[in-house]
């Protein structure tokens, strides 16, 4: 998707200030947002690319002015409403007014502990390329999420490593 989120190589945003001894979360609610995101993804409400796409659809001014976890929260709210897990009114009120829609799969503590160690996925099909292969990326403009940033489209490169497929 071509939108404001794809800022790789863009000038004019100034120096990135690194916070010394930066905590993982600046506020407790950020940790809860991460936990909800992980539970919803494990529960198959959505996947990581769908989560990113929801954030990429935020209005540019919102995307640029929100913090990292604010974008996650806004994207989750959109996805929760679109998928029928809650209504906008319920989110605003902070509680359900009708019985909720169940997730396809429930996250348990043991399942979380097993999954949190790695995001590695077994390769589902033979790799199309191998390290050392010369490749050219496509110059695409998809309407949904892509992992190919604008600055890398239509460019020549060499495969350095394969990390599986999914």
Label each region the model flagged.
Residues 1-100:
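N-terminal intrinsically disordered, low-complexity, charge/repeat-rich segments that act as generic
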Residues 92-145, 152:
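Mixed-charge, Lys/Arg-rich low-complexity intrinsically disordered regions
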Residues 10-40, 80, 119-128, 141-166:
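Basic/aromatic-rich interaction segments and small domains that mediate binding to polyanionic partners
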């Amino acid at each position: 998707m071509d939108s404001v989120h794809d800022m790789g190589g863009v000038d004019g945003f100034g120096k990135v200030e690194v916070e010394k001894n930066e905590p993982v979360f600046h506020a407790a609610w950020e940790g809860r947002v991460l936990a909800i995101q992980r539970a919803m993804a494990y529960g198959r409400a959505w996947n990581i690319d769908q989560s990113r796409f929801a954030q990429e659809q935020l209005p540019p001014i919102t995307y640029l002015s929100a913090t990292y976890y604010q974008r996650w929260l806004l994207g989750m709210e959109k996805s929760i409403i679109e998928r029928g897990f809650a209504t906008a009114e319920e989110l605003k009120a902070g509680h359900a007014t009708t019985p909720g829609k169940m997730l396809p799969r429930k996250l348990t503590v043991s399942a979380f502990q097993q999954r949190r160690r790695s995001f590695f996925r077994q390769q589902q099909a033979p790799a199309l390329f191998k390290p050392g292969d010369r490749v050219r990326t496509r110059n695409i403009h998809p309407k949904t999420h892509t992992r190919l940033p604008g600055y890398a489209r239509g460019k020549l490169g060499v495969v350095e490593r394969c990390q599986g497929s999914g």
